[in-house]
Regions:
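Glycine-rich phosphate-binding loops that contact phosphosugars or nucleotide phosphates
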Residues: 8, 17, 78
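Short Gly/Thr/Asp-enriched flexible loops that form oxyanion-binding sites at enzyme active sites
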Residues: 20-38, 75
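Catalytic or ion-translocation cores adjacent to nucleophile or general acid/base/metal-coordination motifs
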Residues: 37-50
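Phosphate-binding and adjacent anionic-ligand microenvironments
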Residues: 32, 52, 57-183
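Short glycine-rich anion-binding loops that position phosphate/pyrophosphate groups of nucleotides
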Residues: 16-20, 116-118
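Single conserved hydrophobic/aromatic residue that forms the stacking wall/gate
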Residues: 1-10
Length: 183
């Protein structure tokens, strides 16, 4: 394993070529790299953004987050327990952007994402953005390390606090005009 020579590195992150999705591998408690799925990434991001904004006293009482209907319901639990409004919208970042547009000037956007490894962490961007997400992820890793946690341990802590979930992804392909009509 070439990663053994990287010393203290306990996470790897990358984006796809058009920089709109982020992937993460973290070391588990055995020191092995494991992939973090899209739902887990959104949980880590949104939990951090809500928690950190509270810690820094940046909340005005009108904050909200957005997830899509295909994204884990654990996000709803995290939002409710932290006193944040959560919007659940159709799949796709255009729908997250629509929620942002509807709340512009009225509420404070904290973050949004979906299980497809996309995340939107700034209100001045209206599509998934891996560049900003990579920066926030580095910030999350440093914040976790300050607490004596790896990202893997942070994820486990989130599960313990908000509940474990099981998921299974299914991909269905529909072809042609009849397929489009079925969708």
């Amino acid at each position: 394993d070439r990663s053994r020579g990287l010393g203290d590195v306990y996470k790897r992150q990358a984006s796809d070529p058009d920089a709109d999705r982020i992937g993460i591998a973290v070391r588990n408690d055995k020191g092995e790299f494991v992939l973090v799925n899209g739902n887990q990434i959104v949980m880590i991001f949104l939990n951090y953004l809500m928690t950190r904004n509270k810690e820094l006293g940046l909340l005005k009482g009108n904050e909200y987050i957005v997830k899509t209907i295909v994204t884990t319901e654990t996000i709803k639990t995290i939002a409710e327990r932290n006193g944040f409004k959560m919007y659940d919208c159709y799949t796709g970042f255009k729908w997250i952007a629509n929620v942002m547009r509807e709340n512009e000037g009225k509420k404070n956007y904290i973050g949004g994402g979906e299980e497809s490894y996309g995340f939107l962490c700034e209100d001045f961007v209206r599509d998934k953005d891996a560049v900003s997400a990579c920066v926030i992820l580095a910030e999350i890793a440093a914040w976790a390390k300050d607490q004596g946690l790896s990202l893997y341990q942070l994820l486990q802590k989130i599960y313990v606090e908000y509940g474990f979930s099981k998921e299974k992804g299914i991909s269905v392909v529909k072809k042609g005009k009849s397929g489009a009509e079925e969708i």
